[in-house]
Amino acid sequence: DSSTSRGLGDVYKRQGNAFVAEAKRQLFGRVGIDLFAGPTETMVIADETVDAEICATDLLGQAEHGYNSPAVMLTNSKKLAVNTLSEIDRILQILPTADTARVSWRDYGEVIVCDTYDEMLNVANDIASEHVQVMTDRDDWFLENMTCYGALFLGPRTNVANGDKVIGTNHTLPTKKAGRYTGGLWVGKFLKTHSYQKILTDEAASEIGSYGSRLCMLEGFVGHAEPVSYTHLTLPTNREV
């Protein structure tokens, strides 16, 4: 039975948890999907212009999503890195969702100290995180130069939670390094393209056919070569197109 006759739509698109991802996996092929999205991911890129408490709360705010939600901080300040780790320990003592966030941070949390902004940029592009919050004295530079991510959140006011709940930008985003080759859900996912071909003159058909025939024979596709050669050799003259 076709997907339509069984009551399925043509395309399924939405964000969600592991159950949503598994449903997409089972349906993919019979219907189209937007993308396979894994556990939520967050990255904080920060320098000494921001304080450790903000970094810690933003990291743990995403770590509470589940037991396998990566949260990574990149900084060029060892002092900020140490203070952020201390703040994370403090917040986990009082966070109501600490049972989940603690496990996620323990297993998937990282603080990486880089020497330069360029190194932070390179590491961020390599990790290709789903959510990337940039809090530095050169946020726009990261916007101009980052190429691999799901969505950027620029400045300490623009935390990921606001993007989740209020701001309104797309939140079906690539995870597990998929940001290296695709973006998130966009209008193009609801469209499809078609191509068509029409050779307008006998001369063009003859020239194309001569190339096509030789290519087919070189590849060993004799059956392909037959219609190409036949059209090339037998088209009537003055044929309407």
Language-model region placement:
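Structural motif
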Residues: D10-K13, N17-F19, D34, E41-V44, ...
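Single conserved hydrophobic/aromatic residue that forms the stacking wall/gate
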Residues: D1-Y12, H232-V241
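A general structural motif
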Residues: A23-R25, E48-C55, L92, V111-T116, ...
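Conserved NAD(P)+-binding/catalytic subdomain of aldehyde/semialdehyde dehydrogenases
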Residues: R6, D10-P70
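Short loop-to-beta-strand entry elements in the cores of soluble alpha/beta enzymes
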Residues: L35-A46, Q62-L85, A101-I112, S129-D137, ...
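C-terminal core of ALDH-fold dehydrogenases
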Residues: Y117, N125-L233
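Generic secondary-structure signature for well-ordered alpha-helical cores
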Residues: R25-G29, D47-D51, L60-N68, K79, ...
